[in-house]
Amino acid sequence: MPMRIERDLHMAIGNGETSYTKNSRIQEKAMFQMKSVLEEATRAVCTTLLPQTMVVADLGCSSGPNTLRFVTEVTRIIAHHCKLEHNRRHDHLPQLQFFLNDLPGNDFNNLFQLIEQFNKSSTTHKGDAATEALQPPCYISGLPGSYYTRIFPSESVHLFHSLFCLQWRSQAPEQLKGTQKSCLDIYITKTMSPSMVKLFQQQFQKDFSLFLRLRYEELVSGGQMVLTFIGRKHEDVFTGESNHLYGLLAQSLKSLVDEGLVEKEKLESFYLPIYSPSVGEVEAIVKQLGLFNMNHVKVFEINWDPYDDSEGDDVHNSIESGENVAKCLRAVMEPLVASQFGERILDELFKEYARRVAKHLENEKTKHAVLVLSIEKAIIHV
């Protein structure tokens, strides 16, 4: 069955050992790294706009615990801000409306169960005057749909947030269909032709520009966006950290072709709908559109192995790290890979991938480059 983004682009569902719920620690670590940026943007909304009902949207929310961590963090920031700045009573706190958005294939059933647990946990604090006085009323809804389309009314949202989503494209470049390529070129490689690389770059430019235009329409004047996604440290597109990550996946798929487990034609027609941009590429699009003021942009790094918290260049156990990296990538890629090659190859594929990652880490400890962008809707004078 051919891959379809709107159907197949979602994280591995459920709560099993290969699920996204159990393998989303990298995203959790990224959320911790960008907390100060999120706090600054949230406080700016509270200070400048003073909304009675604050509408917050998490775009590409997925279905794991990080989604509710975001809700908890924003609620905490607002409660703390109101206490410090205004010493507000509970009846004067803003009401919070959270919209959790993702494509229809997302595991919304699991997400709604987490929301129910979250609401029950919040309810247990009722009656505790000290705690309740600091808790803004909070309402949470799911919102299926692509963030590459309009999903909110005009000027209705105060704060947009997105974590590890905007590296995903709305589609693989259309012009690549039917193009002759190497089995290893599922993403950008050093041997890929410049014309093919340009197609990946143009798809990013098209998608990111569209995303910003859509959010501009949906944000209130002075509204904020905090966007965190996989990028690259250097401007040279051939030296991106993601190139290694997905290159090893391509090699693993090629090994299954050699074993007769995967059809060569299926691998030759497979592209990842991904692009990891540089800071320069992101800034250029924001400035070119002129729709947003840029408050903050930075790059930080996270080890491939989410359980490796060391800052050095050595990997202490490459085999274990290889397995950890494979679990994380499987949780993200499983539905896409299964739609193209079938579910029966998944265990063998990611076993091979873990082996290749371990070998790679013996020679080079590699890290994800993560971009954090904080922007504010600009006032355009006609």
UniProtKB/Swiss-Prot annotation:
The gene is AAMT1. GO terms for molecular function: S-adenosylmethionine-dependent methyltransferase activity. It comes from the Eukaryota. Coiled coil: none annotated. Methyltransferase involved in the biosynthesis of methyl anthranilate in response to stresses. Utilizes anthranilic acid as substrate, but not salicylic acid. Produces exclusively the O-methyl ester. PANTHER family: S-ADENOSYL-L-METHIONINE:CARBOXYL METHYLTRANSFERASE FAMILY PROTEIN. This is Anthranilate O-methyltransferase 1. It is an enzyme of class 2 (transferase).
